[in-house]
């Protein structure tokens, strides 16, 4: 791509915002020009605003340290400086919806990491390898908003990114009837590090607010279809989920139990995973993993500590496939929750939108 788009990050000081900042450094298509956050941070340099809260393992990029943080609520000012924004704010859902819609109506496309608009009927919730065609709803959304350029597109919840990609090629070939999923989710998913979450040390917390509902409902929108001016959710598979917070820094793991309309052999499942390529790979998007789904033959893999950075944290790792006594099969999955599951997935979605001309 010859053009480089000017990009802003709204919610730049939080953990996901910090991940956006690191991912956008030296991005071939996107140039980070604007950082915005709450009024508390506005008027400070990015280094001052973040202070001791920098949570990335790599140092803060020199290019952003002296950049002035702007007030995210001054929508027209921020929107005028960029071609589109990434949004990763920590606010009540109704306020997030209002803020994202305000940016869209200011003719500034929004690529959101937030959950507030995931079930807005004409807002595409996209994993580029799975349902890239859902971005075709954007003209209908623009009509509702009364915009020419502005729109909202969102990524799905981080918990889904470990198991939905593994189920997707199996859905297409064999028809998934039902699935039971138990997720074991890293503390960075709560925006925490170990020094800021002492209660997780030597502990497992068997509840994450709202996470089980998202884990059961959101896949059905991903597997849905466009009908007129809205997206119709798929009716199956039936998914039941239990979500745990575990003492892991990064990387969400899932135990998956699945039954099929037409039960495949183990070899057919492994072949479906090995051969799967989505639009992100076909378009050769900059952040796309070459091999989306990686299967490990070792009995003790995948592990977050060993495998979360596979393909720069953008791959999904699978292992321990075997037949089950109640379901047809069971297996384990893992993905990096702040890369594939959050900022990295949003950057990949933005690359898809750019490649398809939605920012022009």
Predicted features and spans:
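N-terminal Rossmann-like NAD(P) cofactor-binding subdomain of oxidoreductases
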Residues: 1-207, 237-238, 310, 316-317, ...
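Charged docking surfaces used in two-component/phosphorelay signaling
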Residues: 188-360
């Amino acid at each position: 791509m010859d053009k480089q788009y000017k990009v802003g990050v709204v919610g730049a000081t939080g953990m996901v915002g910090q991940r956006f900042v690191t991912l956008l450094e030296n991005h071939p298509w996107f140039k980070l020009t604007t950082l915005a956050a709450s009024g508390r941070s506005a008027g400070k340099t990015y280094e001052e605003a973040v202070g001791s809260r920098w949570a990335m393992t790599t140092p803060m990029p020199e290019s952003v340290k002296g950049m002035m943080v702007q007030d995210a609520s001054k929508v027209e000012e921020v929107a005028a400086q960029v071609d589109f924004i990434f949004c990763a704010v920590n606010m009540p859902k109704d306020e997030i919806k209002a803020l994202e819609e305000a940016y869209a109506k200011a003719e500034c496309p929004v690529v959101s990491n937030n959950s507030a608009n995931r079930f807005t009927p004409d807002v595409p919730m996209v994993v580029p390898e799975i349902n890239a065609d859902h971005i075709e709803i954007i003209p209908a959304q623009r009509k509702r908003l009364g915009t020419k350029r502005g729109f909202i597109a969102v990524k799905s919840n981080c918990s889904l990114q470990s198991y939905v990609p593994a189920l997707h090629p199996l859905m297409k070939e064999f028809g998934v009837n039902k699935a039971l999923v138990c997720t074991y989710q890293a503390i960075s998913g709560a925006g925490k590090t170990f020094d800021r979450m002492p209660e997780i040390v030597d502990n497992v917390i068997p509840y994450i607010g709202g996470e089980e509902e998202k884990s059961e409902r959101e896949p059905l929108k991903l597997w849905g279809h466009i009908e007129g001016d809205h997206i119709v959710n798929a009716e199956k598979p039936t998914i039941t989920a239990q979500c745990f917070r575990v003492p892991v820094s990064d990387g969400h793991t899932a135990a998956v139990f699945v039954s099929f309309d037409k039960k495949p052999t183990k070899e057919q499942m492994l072949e479906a995973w090995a051969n799967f390529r989505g639009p992100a790979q076909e378009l050769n998007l900059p952040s796309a993993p070459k091999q989306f789904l990686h299967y490990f033959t070792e009995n003790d893999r995948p592990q977050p500590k060993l495998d979360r950075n596979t393909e720069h944290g953008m791959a999904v790792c699978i292992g321990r496939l075997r037949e089950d006594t109640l379901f047809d099969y069971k297996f384990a999955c893992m993905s990096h929750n702040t890369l594939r599951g959050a900022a990295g997935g949003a950057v990949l979605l933005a690359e898809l939108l750019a490649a398809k001309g939605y920012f022009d």
